[in-house]
Design a protein with these regions (language model features):
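Terminal domain-initiation and capping elements
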Residues: 1-120
Length: 120
């Protein structure tokens, strides 16, 4: 097995707690599904949020869907003028037999505009 990183992001419709939890769960579920992963394959996940998302930690959504013993961390993105608002990003470190070219990076909703080069 090789260690790989998987990227992803989702843009939320609002900044409330439920929106953060729902969108983060959707993003994590899609990353896992598209890359044929189980939580045993995940080494760690780093979540970031844009400065306008303060109602909840995105990691809570991952805990609620089964990431009980996976190290998770949340951080704030820097406030860049003109940056896309209401975005949760993730970078998951995983163990996989897939080559780097076969990793499915997941960008949902409006966040697809962030990485047209790798969004699937």
């Amino acid at each position: 097995m090789t260690v790989r990183a998987v990227r992803g992001a989702v843009q939320l419709d609002s900044t409330d707690r439920d929106a953060i939890l729902e969108a983060t769960a959707e993003l994590v579920t899609e990353v896992m599904s598209r890359n044929d992963l189980t939580t045993d394959d995940v080494i760690s996940v780093l979540f970031t949020t844009t400065p306008d998302l303060t109602a909840e930690f995105p990691a809570l959504a991952a805990r609620k869907i089964g990431f009980h013993d996976v190290p998770l961390m949340c951080a704030a993105e820097i406030a860049v003028p003109g940056a896309m608002p209401r975005v949760v990003r993730l970078m998951a470190h995983i163990e996989t037999d897939r080559p780097r070219s076969a990793i499915q990076h997941v960008y949902l909703r409006g966040a697809i505009a962030l990485r047209l080069d790798i969004a699937q």
